[in-house]
Amino acid sequence: MKDFCIIGSGISGATIANSLSKKYSLDVYDKARGAGGRSSNKKLSKNESFDHGVQYISPKSTQFKKFIKNLLTKKIVKKWPGKHLFLNTDKKEDKKHIKIIGKKGNNAISKHLLKDIDCNFNSEVVKIFNNNKIWEVSFSDGSKKLYKSLILTCPFPQLKKLSKRYIKHSFINKKIKMDANITVMMVIKKRKLNISSYFFNDKILGWAGNEN
């Protein structure tokens, strides 16, 4: 039996897994086909891909800046070059906040942190049960695994469904609405304009980005 089961392979889950793996045994599970979570990337060809999750990362805290600086040194991420146009007058770009993207897609951070860790994709957790301080984790394919400890980094609706009976904190009963976004991924002929993103003044079309 391993020490930890971590559900979710986004930046949070990957960071926790990377840190714990130095001392403990663990497995990471994700219902998606690959690592990334909110920073998912869809590969189109060997050299082309779409970051259809988070568009970029803008580190603000001292700790996060240090974390990103280390990834910049290792060439896992890079600064997002080009102009960023804010056509919405209610929104203004903060020039102090640098924009960081993955060198090979925004899921590069998770993939780097998880490179030596046992990851299980296409693995959806449907139920958790605690018996004598041992966690029984059930999956959609009918299989079950036992772990000493369990860490959930999945989206709140899934977290609430799985863990409500075990979490006593008041936040678990909050009604949190998650708004869906529709992402259109397009390949167009290269243009000479040095513009990396548009923030539109439109109720429906909010953002257009060109990075990976």
Task: Describe each PLM feature range.
Residues 36, 45, 147-196:
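Central helical "cap/lid" subdomain
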Residues 5-7, 29, 125, 145-159:
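Short hydrophobic core segments
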Residues 13-14:
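N-terminal Rossmann-fold NAD(P) dinucleotide-binding loop
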Residues 5-7, 18-45:
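Glycine-rich FAD pyrophosphate-binding loop
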